[in-house]
Amino acid sequence: DQPADVSVGGIVVLRLRHAGQRLQTAQQRATLAFNVLQNELMFAINQKASYDPKRIQVAKRLDNVVILAGGQTVCVITDEDAKGNRSSAFELAQRWAENIRKGILQNVADADSGLT
């Protein structure tokens, strides 16, 4: 199973891997993450300068590290994700969350200046 990239407005923000035995493929995970991030991006563009990038959060749910966008789960960081990025799950989630924030803010700035 090949890794699957997830973009926010054309900016790649994370790369998901297969979630393990009998779980979702990388592409299935990427599709779910993309849908949540599209909704967050539309919300951010509507909010413009008042958008709070702190809506993108890293949290612990049960024994998992997750990334949230406006309270919605973007993705669960799997062992495969962490190993593939030579990182701990928490460090990887922090990095991806920052990528998502930057991607959203860049798209908001572009939309505000008429570049999109």
Regions found by a protein language model. Give the residues of each.
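N-terminal targeting peptides and non-cytosolic leader segments immediately upstream
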Residues: 1-116
